[in-house]
Amino acid sequence: MHSATHPYAGLFIVLEGGEGAGKTTQMGAIATWLENSGWLAKLRSCHVDPPLLLTREPGGTPLGQGLRQLLLHSDLAIDPLAELLLYAADRAQHVAMGIRPQLQRGGIVLCDRYTASTVAYQGYGRGLDLQIIQHINQMATGGLGADLVLWLDLPVAVGLARTQQRGRGDRLEQNAVAFHERVRQGFLALAQQGSDRWQRIDADQPPDQVTQAIQECLAAHLHRWFETLKQRLTGGDRDLP
């Protein structure tokens, strides 16, 4: 299985979704499952170290951690275009310093949010031009896309109720309900456009059932990918198409 979204041997999995979808919980559950089911041991046996990069946007690098604080947890008024460019700066650093090196060595990247969130939040939510966002995403990533996008979808009211239980929300969570409805529509549009790489997961159910659905989706994908990975690594072809 050769990825059409990047030329590297590794596997790039992204979790997307609106507020309160449970992405953080599922990131940890997936990492535990990958370890317990032997997938990370298989990668170690192929001398892939580390076998898994568990990361997020914004905030996947030291620079990104500072940008995350500014974007999500400051009281500053940020212009929508400035916000878009700050997310792009975070992503450019993240791809260069974290995501691409991990994929080059043949490992798995599991990322909480990526380019789709920018389209959904800054495009559909804020109303910025989608072509401009696409161009900026292309610049920030160098065209590096995810192999599999797991979209944790649930009604906006349910997700926001979950976030309210955590206390005062971050800058994005504090937006009006109409904003979050537009964001959800953005994810829906992206899922329809990228149906070969997107998998909708019903997040309006208990966390263990969400985890089970994700595991079932990942299992077949991992088997196909790993067979190709072994051939590429054995042949010394980690980076090349």
UniProtKB/Swiss-Prot annotation:
Main EC class of this protein? transferase
Catalyses: dTMP + ATP = dTDP + ADP
- Decide whether keyword Transferase is in the record: yes
Q: Where does ATP bind?
A: 17-24
Gene3D superfamilies on file: P-loop containing nucleotide triphosphate hydrolases
Q: One MF term in GO for this entry? A: dTMP kinase activity
EC nos = 2.7.4.9
Secretion signal span? none
Q: Name one GO biological process term.
A: dTTP biosynthetic process
Sorted keywords for this record are: ATP-binding, Kinase, Nucleotide biosynthesis, Nucleotide-binding, Transferase
Per the record, what is one GO cellular component? cytosol
Pfam families according to UniProt: Thymidylate_kin
Physiological role: Phosphorylation of dTMP to form dTDP in both de novo and salvage pathways of dTTP synthesis.
**What protein family does this chain belong to?**
Belongs to the thymidylate kinase family.
The protein's name: Thymidylate kinase
Write down the species.
Thermosynechococcus vestitus (strain NIES-2133 / IAM M-273 / BP-1)
